[in-house]
UniProtKB/Swiss-Prot annotation:
Annotated source species: Drosophila melanogaster (Fruit fly)
Keywords, sorted A to Z: Cell membrane, Membrane, Olfaction, Receptor, Sensory transduction, Transducer, Transmembrane, Transmembrane helix
Protein name per UniProt: Odorant receptor 24a
Record gene name: Or24a
Chain ranges passing through the membrane: 15-31, 47-67, 75-95, 125-145, 200-220, 270-290, 296-316
Assembly and interaction partners: Interacts with Orco. Complexes exist early in the endomembrane system in olfactory sensory neurons (OSNs), coupling these complexes to the conserved ciliary trafficking pathway.
Length: 398
């Protein structure tokens, strides 16, 4: 039984970017959040913790490469996600005004769709966006928590066997000795643990924005498809509409063309905002998944569980990007097919031209444009194939 906020019975307006809003508000980076002095200080503190954590993890991993490759990979695997989350944090801050504008405009456009069928589209895709981003949040939370649990269980087992407690942090990081000794060690441990959660909420927020916008654009395209088909519907194809009726259809058709143009413009704006995040994610995804699978092969006991959960979290991340892109492309194709299958040929030449123009525009599928990649399920299969090649190469070397 799912919690109510993950079901279609939950109010739709509260589904709108619910999980990204919750995640980014925790660290003071949600675009619609009031930027008070306390929020600014809190967001800077979280930025500093994440930045220093990335440096300390990378330093530790590079230092241990010639000493112990398994220990080095134990640090370098999570640092890739941490650096990626830092990129996402900076991008969200840099584009906060544009993101706020997009959030407000898409909210306004979706609120205009009020028919029973359109409300069904909204309920379906709003709920899907919340469910998938919450799944990502759960995977990320479990991954970050598993690192701390692993360290605590390892040390508890050491104590039961009469050995000393190892003063290390949940994530392998290089710190001055003073910070790894009592009385400062508990504070260092808590801050490193919080660093893991900052990493999680950053990628949940950014990935949730991407998936949410893609699914909300899909809703707008489906609603546009219904309006076009309803407008062009003709009861008797042999009977020509009156001049007044044709004039009304032309006016309504112009509004629909403008709506289609605006969705295309919003997609372009989203591409500009998400280009750095999406490119970095697609470039590093194979490396991150491959490294985590290699860690599964190298570790035993609790280490395997940690990296199985980690692999699931990274896999869900890249799946959300590809799923969102596929939904937009499919909605565009359906719009073109449905418009061409309507009764456009029963109207005046001007209406026919406008209809065929919309068909031509819809056939140029809307995508989130990033260099070298196009988010889609086909791209996901290519990434997984390349990941398999990296794993095979790593196994042969190690």
């Amino acid at each position: 039984m799912l919690p109510r906020f993950l079901t279609a019975s939950y109010p739709m307006e509260r589904h709108y970017f619910m999980v990204p809003k919750f995640a980014l508000s925790l660290i003071g980076f949600y675009p619609e959040q009031k930027r008070t002095v306390l929020v600014k200080l809190w967001s800077f503190f979280n930025f500093f913790i994440l930045t220093y954590g990335c440096y300390a993890e990378a330093y530790y991993g590079i230092h241990y490469i010639p000493i112990n490759i398994a220990t080095a990979l134990d640090a370098l695997c999570p640092v890739a996600s941490s650096i990626l989350s830092l990129v996402k944090m900076v991008a969200i801050w840099w584009y906060q005004d544009e993101l706020r504008s997009l959030i407000e405009r898409v909210r306004f456009l979706t609120e205009q769709q009020k028919s029973k069928r359109k409300l069904g589209y909204k309920k379906r895709f709003y709920t899907l966006a919340t469910q998938l981003t919450f799944l990502l949040l759960c995977c990320g939370f479990c991954t970050s928590t598993s690192y701390s649990v692993r360290h605590l269980i390892d040390n508890i087992l050491r104590r039961t066997h009469g050995k000393d407690w190892i003063y290390e942090t949940p994530f392998k990081m290089m710190f001055p000795d003073l910070l790894l000794r009592l009385p400062l060690y508990p504070i260092t441990y808590i801050l490193v643990h919080w660093h893991g959660y900052i990493t999680v909420v950053c990628f949940v927020g950014a990935d949730g924005f991407f998936l949410g916008f893609c699914l909300y654009f899909t809703v707008l395209l489906l609603c546009l498809q219904d309006d076009v088909c309803d407008l062009l519907e003709v009861e008797n194809i042999e009977k020509s509409p009156s001049e007044a009726e044709e004039a009304r259809i032309v006016r309504e058709m112009e509004k629909l063309v403008d709506r289609h143009n605006e969705v295309a413009e919003l997609t372009e704006r989203l591409s500009g905002v998400m280009v750095e995040i999406t490119l970095a994610h697609f470039v590093t995804s194979s490396l991150i998944i491959g490294t985590s699978v290699v860690d599964i092969l190298l570790f035993s006991g609790l280490g395997i569980i940690v990296y199985v959960v980690y692999t699931c979290a990274v896999g869900v991340e890249i799946f959300l990007y590809c799923l969102g892109g596929s939904h937009i492309m499919e909605a565009c194709s359906n719009l073109a097919r449905s418009t061409f299958s309507s009764h456009w040929y029963g109207h005046s030449v001007r209406v026919q031209k406008m209809t065929l123009l919309m068909v031509a525009r819809a056939q140029r599928v809307l995508t989130i444009k990033i260099p070298f990649f196009s988010p889609s399920l086909e791209t996901l299969t290519s990434i997984l194939r390349f990941t398999g090649s990296l794993i095979a190469l790593a196994k042969s070397v190690i």
